[in-house]
Amino acid sequence: MKYFNRLIDKELEKWMISEIHQPVLLRGARQTGKSSAVRNLAKKFDYFLEINFEEDKEARLIFEKSNLTPQLLCEKLYSNYDVPIIEGRTLLFFDEIQACTPAISSLRFFFEKMPDLHVIAAGSLLEFAMEEIPSFGVGRIRSLFMYPFSFTEFLEANGNIGLLSEIRKANFQAPLDIVVHNKALYLLKLFMLIGGMPAVVAKYFIDKDLHQCQQILDGLIVSLRDDFAKYKKRIPAVQISAAFDSVIRQIGNKFLYVDKEQVYSAYQIKNAVELLIMAGLIIPVTHTSANGLPLGAEINPKFRKLLLLDTGIFQRLLGLKLSDILLNENFDAINKGGIAEMFAGLELLKASSFYQQTQLFYWQREAKNARAEVDFVIQKNMEIVPIEVKSGKQGKMQSMYLFMKEKKSKMGIRTSLENFAVYDKIRITPLYAIGNEIV
């Protein structure tokens, strides 16, 4: 499959040439492109050894049946795979490393004993394995977090470099030309339909076949559900599946652990949801009082909304046929089930630092006869900024104004299908450019 460049490629290249390069742990949900990014980086090395611990029993035995130093481990790996492991010239890649706990533990010793060897590890269910390791190499291992394609990555891979440049330069004083704006909206609609899972994006760019994209999405959904059995043996897969279905039903709303279609207790669903979050399949948006920075200092973890990691998967879970929606000129056909809010949240997440697991926040007031909610709250230039998401080209903003008055905010952002504009203290940012607000 052809490789389409990702923003994380530049971070991996910086790591490759830096004087100090701790072993990298690529973290993220299954099928988000971690292995492909490493293989792309490997083209810059003289030698490349990839070991998949889920598939390679011999590799697991090497790590599980010996207490070897990194040097001796490399000798055994060389004799077994006939690939020279030379510091500065070889990239050593441990894939699906969650299947071999001793291999995870070995990463810290590679940095201590062989600091010039480039080592990357990745795993789709890595968080579960790391939870069971009492001491993990703090300061000796660098984590990078990876997600599906962002809209920026999608445009770049599609060759829309000029459009991307225009979007980056545009602001409320210099909005996009209407023709350019409409083109961006069409591509936004396409991206929200197929989503950012690399296999789907690649298939679309190669064949432009939405039917095949739909088939790949359906296959990914089956694969993701099959993974539920691997999460934690003490929680049945059927219970995790029920929690997952409950999340899908409640996208865009404060999540209720008990709903009318649910047969499990709130406690059972809560435990299952936590596993879905650990697997990276579900993204939490947590309530914050937003009285000051950091936003995470005043959270209420009992109140949160939950997003799915990909809009394309969500569209298929709703049973929507991609080709029919793309041909429908009414953009509202794609905005069912809170997908605009989901897209905005995912773009904010993807535009954040690769080096930390970014938290998303929202604000809500439950006062009697004065309920208000702001979809997202971000920190921008040491200011607290509220963001409201509108699926169309208009919408009231009472909650935004209430928040700004109560918190004395200097600025708010409304993101919608509108072009760049400003009204009083409310800046209008098109949905396709919302990720730029993090930069």
Could you tell me what each predicted segment is?
Residues 1-17:
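N-terminal pre-Walker A segment at the start of P-loop NTPase domains
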Residues 55-87:
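Short glycine-rich substrate-engagement loop in P-loop NTPases that contacts/grips substrate
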Residues 201-373, 378:
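Accessory nucleic acid-recognition modules appended to NTPase machines
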Residues 37, 41:
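Hydrophobic positions on the alpha1 helix immediately C-terminal to the Walker A/P-loop
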Residues 118-124, 145:
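Structural recognition of the conserved hydrophobic beta-strand(s) that form the central parallel beta-sheet
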Residues 344, 348, 374-393, 412:
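Conserved catalytic cores of phosphodiester-cleaving nucleases, focusing on short active-site segments
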Residues 130-249, 280:
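Interdomain motor-coupling "hinge/lid" segment immediately C-terminal to the ATP-binding subdomain
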Residues 34:
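Conserved lysine of the Walker
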